[in-house]
Amino acid sequence: MAIKGLSIPVFGRYHNKDGVVTYTDGMVNPHAVSYQISLTAGDNNPFYADNRIVENDVGMFSSGILKLETDDFTAETSKYLLGLKEVTRTYGESKTATSLVYDDTQKSPVLGYGIIEEHQINEVNKYKAVILKKVVFGIPEDAATTRGEKIDWQTKTIEGAISRSDEVNDEVSHPWKEDAWFDSEAEALAFLKAMLGVGVKGQ
């Protein structure tokens, strides 16, 4: 069993009402290069008896950082992830352009995030749909290198703060992550779209 691929980040706008969490206005960003989740958890609290550990209160998840590398971010994706405003600028002889503005009013929205891992298990491809339930992305760094005789492909990386969802019901209590396995990438993507509100309009 091994991981052999990664594809298709999906995002959805997070809504909480009295512990009922929903996602709307989902967006599919079609390309992923890599992702990494770094976690912070509480300390383990072992109980010793007879000179050995007989019980252990394992530290629980408290927060995390998602690092997502993609081929690039379009203006639409940047606006969605970072809560940017659009303004229309005029230049030349009555020409106009739409600009994204980073200013004091910029506030990144709370989102759900999903991605698809491709695994090979006993010579068969399986697809793991991973969902982080509550993420807030920060403004990514800007960097670029001029083109020479040979193209040096450059990517874009963004980091997001992971926290526990507000969702509480008979099945879950403040989940921060879930995953499901599928036989095809198409089914994994359909699952992520359904869970993260792609095609569902928010109020």
Predicted segments with their positions:
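Short amphipathic beta-strand/extended segments with alternating polar/hydrophobic composition
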Residues: 23-29, 126-134, 175-180
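Intrinsically disordered, low-complexity coil segments
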Residues: 16, 87-93, 168-174
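Hydrophobic transmembrane signal anchors and adjacent membrane-proximal interface regions, especially
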Residues: 6-8, 12, 67, 89, ...
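Solvent-exposed edge beta-strands and adjacent loop segments
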Residues: 1-82, 134-152
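Structured, beta-strand-rich domain cores
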Residues: 58-130
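Compositionally biased, intrinsically disordered low-complexity regions enriched in proline and serine
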Residues: 15, 24, 49, 92, ...
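Mixed-charge, glycine-accented linear interaction segment located at domain edges/termini
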Residues: 135-203
